[in-house]
Amino acid sequence: RANHYPALDKPPLPGQLRAGAHSDYGSLTLLFQEEGLSGLEILNRQKKWTPVAQCKPEMIVNLGDLMERWTNGRWISTLHRVNLPDTNNNPNQSRMSLAFFHQPDWDARIECLPMCVSPGETAKYSVVTSGRHLMERFHSTVLDVDDSTLSEIEEKNKNN
Protein backbone atom coordinates (compact mmCIF):
# COMPACT_ATOMS: atom_id res chain seq x y z
CA ARG A 1 0.00 0.00 0.00
CA ALA A 2 1.27 3.44 -0.86
CA ASN A 3 0.72 6.01 1.89
CA HIS A 4 0.82 9.75 1.36
CA TYR A 5 0.56 12.12 4.29
CA PRO A 6 0.23 15.65 2.87
CA ALA A 7 1.96 18.70 4.29
CA LEU A 8 0.02 20.59 6.92
CA ASP A 9 -1.82 23.65 5.67
CA LYS A 10 -2.75 24.82 9.17
CA PRO A 11 -1.50 24.17 12.71
CA PRO A 12 -2.41 20.69 14.00
CA LEU A 13 -4.97 20.16 16.72
CA PRO A 14 -3.67 18.99 20.11
CA GLY A 15 -3.02 15.24 19.97
CA GLN A 16 -3.52 15.07 16.20
CA LEU A 17 -1.66 12.25 14.42
CA ARG A 18 -1.19 11.23 10.81
CA ALA A 19 -2.11 7.64 11.67
CA GLY A 20 -3.39 6.54 15.07
CA ALA A 21 -1.95 3.74 17.18
CA HIS A 22 -2.48 0.27 15.73
CA SER A 23 -0.87 -3.09 15.15
CA ASP A 24 -0.82 -4.78 11.76
CA TYR A 25 -3.33 -7.56 11.18
CA GLY A 26 -1.18 -10.06 9.29
CA SER A 27 2.08 -11.77 10.14
CA LEU A 28 4.63 -9.25 8.96
CA THR A 29 4.94 -5.82 7.36
CA LEU A 30 7.81 -4.48 5.27
CA LEU A 31 7.87 -0.68 5.26
CA PHE A 32 9.89 1.62 3.04
CA GLN A 33 10.04 5.37 3.76
CA GLU A 34 11.64 8.43 2.25
CA GLU A 35 15.04 9.17 3.75
CA GLY A 36 14.86 11.65 6.62
CA LEU A 37 11.05 11.83 6.58
CA SER A 38 9.83 9.55 9.30
CA GLY A 39 7.21 10.26 11.92
CA LEU A 40 6.87 6.54 12.59
CA GLU A 41 6.84 5.76 16.32
CA ILE A 42 6.60 2.48 18.24
CA LEU A 43 5.35 1.89 21.75
CA ASN A 44 8.35 0.52 23.67
CA ARG A 45 8.35 -1.84 26.66
CA GLN A 46 8.27 1.14 29.03
CA LYS A 47 4.99 2.19 27.33
CA LYS A 48 6.56 5.31 25.81
CA TRP A 49 6.24 6.35 22.18
CA THR A 50 9.69 6.20 20.59
CA PRO A 51 10.60 7.55 17.13
CA VAL A 52 11.97 4.94 14.75
CA ALA A 53 15.46 6.08 13.77
CA GLN A 54 15.73 7.13 10.15
CA CYS A 55 19.09 6.65 8.50
CA LYS A 56 19.75 5.87 4.88
CA PRO A 57 16.92 4.38 2.84
CA GLU A 58 16.10 1.19 4.66
CA MET A 59 13.41 -1.39 5.15
CA ILE A 60 11.59 -1.53 8.48
CA VAL A 61 10.10 -4.88 9.53
CA ASN A 62 7.08 -4.88 11.84
CA LEU A 63 5.73 -8.09 13.33
CA GLY A 64 1.97 -8.41 13.08
CA ASP A 65 -0.83 -9.98 15.10
CA LEU A 66 -0.59 -13.41 13.50
CA MET A 67 3.13 -13.70 14.27
CA GLU A 68 2.30 -12.96 17.91
CA ARG A 69 -0.33 -15.72 17.88
CA TRP A 70 2.01 -18.23 16.23
CA THR A 71 4.74 -17.55 18.80
CA ASN A 72 2.35 -17.55 21.79
CA GLY A 73 3.24 -13.95 22.55
CA ARG A 74 7.01 -14.48 22.54
CA TRP A 75 7.27 -12.14 19.57
CA ILE A 76 5.05 -9.11 20.02
CA SER A 77 2.94 -7.44 17.36
CA THR A 78 4.35 -3.94 17.15
CA LEU A 79 2.00 -1.17 18.27
CA HIS A 80 2.89 1.86 16.17
CA ARG A 81 1.60 5.20 14.90
CA VAL A 82 2.63 8.02 12.58
CA ASN A 83 3.16 11.35 14.30
CA LEU A 84 3.05 14.78 12.69
CA PRO A 85 6.27 16.49 11.63
CA ASP A 86 7.97 18.83 14.05
CA THR A 87 6.23 22.11 13.27
CA ASN A 88 9.24 24.07 14.52
CA ASN A 89 11.61 22.49 12.02
CA ASN A 90 9.53 21.77 8.94
CA PRO A 91 5.75 22.22 9.18
CA ASN A 92 5.28 21.91 5.42
CA GLN A 93 6.77 18.43 5.19
CA SER A 94 4.73 15.73 3.48
CA ARG A 95 5.50 12.05 4.01
CA MET A 96 5.31 9.03 1.75
CA SER A 97 5.83 5.38 2.53
CA LEU A 98 5.27 2.04 0.87
CA ALA A 99 4.07 -0.92 2.94
CA PHE A 100 3.91 -4.59 2.01
CA PHE A 101 1.60 -6.55 4.31
CA HIS A 102 2.07 -10.31 4.45
CA GLN A 103 -1.21 -12.08 5.15
CA PRO A 104 -1.24 -15.90 5.09
CA ASP A 105 -3.76 -17.69 2.86
CA TRP A 106 -7.37 -17.13 3.84
CA ASP A 107 -7.82 -20.70 5.16
CA ALA A 108 -4.44 -20.97 6.91
CA ARG A 109 -4.85 -22.17 10.50
CA ILE A 110 -3.21 -19.79 12.91
CA GLU A 111 -2.29 -21.68 16.05
CA CYS A 112 0.58 -21.64 18.48
CA LEU A 113 3.68 -23.37 17.14
CA PRO A 114 4.59 -26.37 19.35
CA MET A 115 8.11 -25.00 19.94
CA CYS A 116 6.58 -21.83 21.45
CA VAL A 117 4.81 -23.61 24.31
CA SER A 118 6.90 -24.65 27.31
CA PRO A 119 6.05 -27.85 29.20
CA GLY A 120 3.00 -27.22 31.36
CA GLU A 121 2.12 -24.06 29.44
CA THR A 122 -0.96 -23.65 27.26
CA ALA A 123 -1.54 -21.54 24.18
CA LYS A 124 -2.59 -17.96 24.98
CA TYR A 125 -4.66 -17.60 21.81
CA SER A 126 -7.42 -19.73 20.33
CA VAL A 127 -6.99 -21.29 16.90
CA VAL A 128 -8.34 -19.10 14.11
CA THR A 129 -8.03 -18.97 10.34
CA SER A 130 -6.12 -16.11 8.78
CA GLY A 131 -9.26 -14.89 7.01
CA ARG A 132 -11.41 -14.99 10.14
CA HIS A 133 -8.79 -13.02 12.07
CA LEU A 134 -8.60 -10.44 9.28
CA MET A 135 -12.38 -10.03 9.17
CA GLU A 136 -12.62 -9.78 12.98
CA ARG A 137 -9.99 -7.03 12.97
CA PHE A 138 -11.75 -5.18 10.14
CA HIS A 139 -15.00 -5.56 12.05
CA SER A 140 -13.52 -4.14 15.24
CA THR A 141 -11.75 -1.21 13.60
CA VAL A 142 -13.45 -0.31 10.33
CA LEU A 143 -16.42 -2.32 9.13
CA ASP A 144 -19.87 -2.30 10.66
CA VAL A 145 -20.85 -5.92 10.04
CA ASP A 146 -22.35 -8.65 12.19
CA ASP A 147 -21.11 -12.22 12.73
CA SER A 148 -23.40 -13.69 10.05
CA THR A 149 -21.89 -11.31 7.48
CA LEU A 150 -18.39 -12.39 8.56
CA SER A 151 -19.43 -16.02 8.04
CA GLU A 152 -20.81 -15.20 4.57
CA ILE A 153 -17.55 -13.50 3.60
CA GLU A 154 -15.57 -16.51 4.85
CA GLU A 155 -17.78 -18.90 2.88
CA LYS A 156 -17.46 -16.83 -0.31
CA ASN A 157 -13.64 -16.78 0.02
CA LYS A 158 -13.50 -20.56 0.53
CA ASN A 159 -15.24 -21.05 -2.80
CA ASN A 160 -12.90 -18.74 -4.75
Role assignments for model-derived ranges:
Residues 1-160:
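C-terminal flanking tails of non-heme Fe-dependent oxygenases
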